[in-house]
Amino acid sequence: MYSERAKSIMPVRKLVVTGMLAGVSILLGSTPLGFIPIGPAKATIMHLPVIIGAIMEGPLVAIGIGLIFGVFSMIQAIMAPTVISFVFLNPLVAVLPRMLIGLTAYYTYKMTKSAAASATIGTLTNTIGVLGMIYMLYGAQFAAALGQDQGKAAALILGIATTNGIPEVIVAVIVVTAVTAALKRIRKA
């Protein structure tokens, strides 16, 4: 009897957690909280629900939440454009790296059992994935849009990675560690 009940509860719990994290992602994507302007670039905390989803419910849930993050990146590029928004109209820049956050965060957590390590790797996946795609697909155009020498695109992108990436990792480690610990305590209760 108990195993039958447990089998039916698990999908419901997963659905609830997925809905909650998707709702948080939609809220962050719909408000200035999710994309924080820093000059023409934007720092983000939208990767946090993706990482939390990876740790709590696995890679498929996290990939779905990452898809929401990526779609909102594209919407932001249209609704609140900056001089560099053109790069986020490409799903290879805006969506693919955000979906990969869930995979890297999940497998890091599975190997290390560390929310901090998972948060770090997930955040770096976002930063390196997005900026790497920008460099590969739009390096010179990106630098020109920022009024910089096109030959210095790599240095410019590395500067953005450092300026945005380090604070994003720090915030992710603090928030993801605290939230996943709280959710695990609730789950055990």
Regions found by a protein language model. Name each.
Residues 1-189:
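Loop-helix junctions at membrane interfaces
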